[in-house]
């Protein structure tokens, strides 16, 4: 569950809005006719891709980044946060959108504090172990409050919480290529403290400043993060081109074979042929 699920309970809702919520609210109000047009179109013909929705915004979305003037995309994002619109699947690379009332179960909306508690519990279940209190981020929180039970991480300061349902469970490690947005690496501070893994997504860096590649994938082996895969999908050529496997530790024969299998599996999933470096 992402942070927008909590925002549905908070905005619109009771209490004072945070600064960014006030800005967003004002923009949505200024473009309320566009909001209504989108909802009416979805009500009549949804689910639909964004290309079939009307952009009747009178006040463009202004930013200094790549979202500048992307009115429909930003309006849909805000309607998702408001609990009015939801993703309904996809066709190819296009996401489909529909009225949230057709997608979400008709369950009573919990109070804000109850929603926070449930999110903390789900977040901890996904992470296994996490800080009780962490840095405030504009995206999904990285801490879990009082969910779970107290834990101590040897050599790392701070208050930690552990999911009691996972204590004592047998662990079977495996090899995996992770998304740069996987929960295991999304919290860079936790990643460094628990795994001593140096990694950052470099797609926003100039090419000459990159160390591991434009969209390098962290490599998991067993219970350690051991490297990064620099690969690119050449769809016209039908190939998954592997530029490098950056090894943070020496790879054993078994590790090399396991990572190679993951690369082949990724290529098969993408319907591409893997091309390894010479």
Task: Describe the residue ranges of each PLM region.
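Long, charged, low-complexity, helical-prone intrinsically disordered regions
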Residues: 1-278
């Amino acid at each position: 569950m992402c942070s927008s699920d909590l925002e549905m309970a908070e905005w619109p809702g009771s209490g004072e809005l945070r600064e960014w919520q006030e800005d967003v609210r004002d923009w949505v109000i200024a473009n309320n006719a566009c909001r209504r047009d989108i909802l009416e179109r979805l009500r009549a013909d949804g689910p639909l891709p964004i290309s079939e929705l009307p952009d009747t915004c009178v006040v463009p979305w202004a930013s200094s980044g790549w979202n500048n003037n992307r009115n429909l995309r930003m309006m849909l994002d805000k309607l998702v946060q408001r609990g009015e619109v939801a993703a309904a699947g996809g066709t190819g690379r296009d996401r489909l959108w529909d009225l949230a009332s057709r997608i979400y179960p008709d369950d009573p909306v919990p109070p804000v504090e109850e929603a926070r508690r449930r999110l903390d519990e789900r977040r901890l279940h996904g992470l296994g172990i996490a800080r009780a209190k962490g840095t405030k981020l504009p995206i999904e929180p990285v801490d879990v409050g009082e969910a779970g039970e107290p834990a101590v991480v040897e050599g790392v300061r701070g208050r930690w919480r552990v999911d009691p349902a996972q204590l004592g469970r047998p662990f079977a490690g495996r090899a995996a290529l992770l998304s740069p947005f996987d929960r295991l690496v999304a919290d860079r501070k936790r990643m460094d403290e628990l795994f001593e893994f140096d990694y950052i997504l470099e797609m926003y860096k100039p090419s000459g400043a990159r160390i591991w590649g434009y969209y390098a994938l962290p490599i998991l082996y067993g219970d350690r993060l051991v490297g990064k895969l620099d690969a690119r999908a050449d769809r016209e050529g039908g190939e998954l081109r592997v530029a490098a496997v950056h090894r943070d530790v020496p790879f054993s024969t078994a590790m090399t074979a396991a990572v190679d299998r993951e690369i082949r599996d990724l290529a098969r999933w993408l319907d591409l042929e893997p091309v390894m470096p010479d």
